[in-house]
Amino acid sequence: MAARKAKHAFRSQATQSDAERQDLDSKLAAVLESRGNANAVFDILEHLESKKEDVVQAAIRTTSKLFEVLLEKRELYIGDLPAEDDSPPDTCSAEDKYKMWMRNRYNSCVSCLLDLLQYSSFSVQELVLCTLMKFIQLEGKFPLENSEWRDSYRFPRELLKFVVDNLLQEEADCTLLITRFQEYLEYDDVRYYTMTVTTECVSRIQQKNKQVLPPVFQTNVFCLLSSINMPVEESTLGNFLVTKNENHEEWKPSKLKEQKRVFERVWMSFLKHQLSVSLYKKVLLILHESILPHMSKPSLMIDFLTAAYDVGGAISLLALNGLFILIHQHNLEYPDFYKKLYSLLEPSVFHVKYRARFFHLANLFLSSTHLPVYLVAAFAKRLARLALTAPPQVLLMIIPFICNLIRRHPACRVLIHRPSAGDLVTDPYIMEEQDPAKSQALESCLWELEVLQQHYHGDVVRAANVISRALSAQESDVSGLLEMSSCELFDKEMKKKFKSVPLEYEPVRGLLGLKSDITAEHFTF
């Protein structure tokens, strides 16, 4: 019985929704047919506040059709719109009064649509976003302002500002809707003005929250900025949402220099604030490919990168990429850079997610033959000491890495050919010293590599045995070893085919067992 009632209620609601949609269609036709039916616009807008999702969607589509026609027919007042509560001037004609009234209805519609960007259903949010962007396109084609721009090219910046402000919420996560908005960022004019209004939004929220950006707001801003695909050449600019026949060569969005300027400005306004650790990592991961190449002055990022480099841990590792670009491509200096890089060599560096990236960059930074011998020796010695507790897949990369350092700097060969090398107790190297210049590494030797010649893994033993022979001048290629995992190493071992199966750690010799057996020493069988 209850199921039958529920089914009946559902059918009743569906019938009612169909009736409301038909009512919307009839009112739309009536408004477009005669100005005498203009008051029906109120009924159409009222449906935007319906509690039924399908009715809300129907109302959104109806308002889109309605104001698209009215904008094309120039049925909305053009110019500075007086406040709705104020009486229109006596000089206003009936035509102007009607257009003012309809312009106010359009503004009310836009206001309702902006509120619906926070609707519970994503399908409604998406439909609203597309409708508002359609209005932006129409306002650009049929401007509602009288002001003459220098190049006769208008863009409804104010409406876009309202849209972006609603995407960059302080408390609501809008990343899904921002991802949908990414499609419009492919338009050069939308991209340019989005970056401009985002800068203003960040500044406004900063002042409102006493120089602090709320975490959710930070996430929304990053999602928006990371969705921007910047053009590389000016010749590719020309894909505009708002199209005009006039020449737009002098228009700022059509200039790559101006695009870079606002891109740089919006990122700098965002990154000057304290970010969460997770957001720091996300920014640093895309910095070298998606941000620095598109900035007018990449050197402005030095403060952000040095601050990130000083944080420690994975964030410092990720900051290396950006610093490498600034140091090698833009000739920027970083005091105590190698001292900081040296301090990052901790046991945890072998287990972090970004290990391969770190050692790739460390290899680049240590590739110069002009580095002081004591510095290279300190890096080689510290890596060798850390190798004593490293897993085998890391050792297969670390040992060739150390050997390459010695090959580049022949003066460091003393580390593997020191005849007066003492034991572990007399090793002069100071592991706890953070300054490589004071670590006394050059007075030590790489006895750690000799220890690794007794490692349980055969490949590690073969790699460590290199120091027992004359070291070749040709460097080893470690690029293929940087990302080796324990699973890959295990799979490699599983594929090996052995001629004999080892049954004992020490193979039995003779009938009486091991060679060291007391019986075998006196009897031979």
UniProtKB/Swiss-Prot annotation:
Main location: nucleus
Key words of the record: Membrane, Nucleus, Transmembrane, Transmembrane helix
Keyword Nucleus: yes
Covalent S-S links between cysteines: none
Membrane topology of the entry: Multi-pass membrane protein
GO CC aspect terms: Noc4p-Nop14p complex; nuclear membrane; nucleolus; small-subunit processome
Stretches that traverse the bilayer: 307-327, 358-378, 386-406
Segments of this protein annotated with the region Disordered: 1-21
InterPro entries per UniProt: ARM-type_fold, CCAAT-binding_factor, Noc4
Entry superkingdom: Eukaryota
Alphabetized Pfam families for the sequence: CBF
Biased composition (Basic residues): 1-10
Subcellular location: Nucleus membrane; Nucleus, Nucleolus
BP GO annotations: ribosome biogenesis
Family membership noted in the UniProt record: Belongs to the CBF/MAK21 family.
Record's protein name: Nucleolar complex protein 4 homolog B
UniProt source species: Xenopus laevis
